[in-house]
């Protein structure tokens, strides 16, 4: 009887999550049904950074650009991964592994890793693997980065839309902040996942093959978790400490973006010198 009750709680939790997503997505149309101009503006604000970053990544693949249809499929799978992440974070929340209310630094760490980084990056990896496992277009090292970036942008697009629609009164400010930090952050997580994914595929006999297999998930999870921990910890810190953490956060973002850019150039160089063993 107790097991049935637990299953019912989990089922109800998932139904509630789906309902919340649908409600947040439709909330704006219900509240602002008479203002189509505002509707388009909010949607454009959410999507603009995603489109710009996808275009930049697409242009980086200059040797053999990927078919646009394949990129769209990867993007849509990224949107799907947003829902798949609930299948992981839901039970962890019910089990008390993390809580949405953050009052201590430990709460921030648990929410950042178990509520966001781990379930979200695993979900992205799952759809990336499903998409690339027998994909004939995945024939260059940089392709792994391009497709993983598109998956991450699909995830970021839906997340951005939900955030802006749920903060409709301040959507422009929220949109600008997320365009500077959150969306590029997801792009960097995707770049790192794709970087190691390509190393695993194209260098199966490398001495670092096992390490690369681990790094496919470990690196994006660590980057994502540290990124979110600094953001969530603001609520728990003294005002002076908040300033220190904010400066650290800016430095972290700059180094992460620079590091991700170098990884793209590395794979582009490898593709131009095909045959070099890793």
Predicted segments, located by residue:
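Hydrophobic alpha-helical segments at protein termini of multi-pass membrane proteins
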Residues: 28-278
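Short hydrophobic targeting helices and cationic amphipathic motifs
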Residues: 4-8, 14
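Short, positively charged and aromatic/hydrophobic N-terminal segments
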Residues: 13, 19-20, 27-34
